[in-house]
Design a protein with these regions (language model features):
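Active-site substrate-binding loop specific to GH73 endo-beta-N-acetylglucosaminidase modules
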Residues: 1-277
């Protein structure tokens, strides 16, 4: 709703600086906006409407390295770099006004704990949960290794997304309630919907929405019993304790075992019942 007749020279400069701070995720350094301001002034002098010239200035800012590249510098992060690191880590998006204002006055580092709590309570932190869990446990591999035809009858179309959602919701629950790390292994509950519960052989769960379900007396508790965990650590056809064991070592214990000695031959596949074309 902004009109050209409302834009004075001072107002244009102020709007450019405000826009640049959000685009660059920091305050513009001395002289950084001079080329943009000169461009806008030149276009206005050439007869372009101030509003159109301002839009051109915005476009120029969005084409600059300060916007296109996330350059946090070397060494200890300054306040603006800390705001960007925090925001992209927890929200996968640029810092909001609160973070930028705290960075501007130099108070972000002192209030870091309260800002982390604020950001984790925001729905945008669901992006962190999704990206972190999928990267940690390779959950994006689910679907690239479908089960063999013999088992497709047990593998419904929406199970893949439900499996991911179970693990992500479980991680979110542990995070929100500040539970100890052992909860990932010995929890006696999970978050299931009807399809996933039926796949696990659990009765009495209705609807598509995930809800907390007690698993007392079951071996399903914890990440090791999640369908997503078991699917991501398999190839969809064969059971391989070695492959799954390496997956557990790397993802849970943070240890990558060395390769087998060169004099240990590969295990030949069982082809006793195989046929040829």
């Amino acid at each position: 709703n902004l009109r050209s007749d409302e834009l004075t020279k001072e107002n244009i400069i102020q709007r450019l600086r405000s826009f640049a701070q959000k685009a660059f995720r920091r305050a513009p350094v001395a002289g950084e906006l001079e080329p943009v301001q000169k461009l806008v002034s030149q276009k206005i002098n050439d007869g372009m409407a101030p509003l159109e010239a301002l839009k051109l200035g915005f476009q120029s800012i969005l084409c600059s390295p300060g916007f296109l590249y996330l350059n946090l510098g070397e060494g200890e992060l300054n306040e603006y770099a800390l705001a960007s690191r925090l925001s992209y880590f927890l929200w996968s998006s640029p810092p909001d006004d609160t973070l930028l204002n705290l960075a501007r006055i130099g108070s972000l580092r002192a209030g870091l704990s309260s800002q982390v709590k604020r950001m984790l309570s925001d729905s945008r932190s669901d992006r962190f949960v999704r990206h972190f869990v999928r990267s940690w446990l390779d959950l994006d591999n689910i679907g690239s290794m479908p089960p063999s035809q013999d088992f497709l009858v047990y593998y419904r179309d929406n199970l893949e997304s439900a499996m991911r959602d179970e693990t992500e919701t479980f991680f979110r629950h542990v995070l929100d309630n500040n539970l100890p790390p052992r909860e990932f292994l010995d929890a006696n509950y999970s978050f299931l919907n009807r399809e996933l519960a039926l796949h696990y052989g659990i009765q009495g769960v209705e609807g598509n929405k995930l809800r907390r379900v007690s698993l007392s007396g079951s071996s399903r508790g914890g990440l090791l019993g999640h369908g997503a965990f078991l699917t991501a650590s398999a190839n969809g056809v064969d059971t391989s304790p070695v492959v799954r064991g390496i997956y557990v070592l790397e993802k849970i214990l943070g240890y990558t075992p060395p390769p087998p000695p060169p004099d240990v031959p590969a295990v030949e596949p069982d082809i006793r019942n195989a046929t040829t074309i």
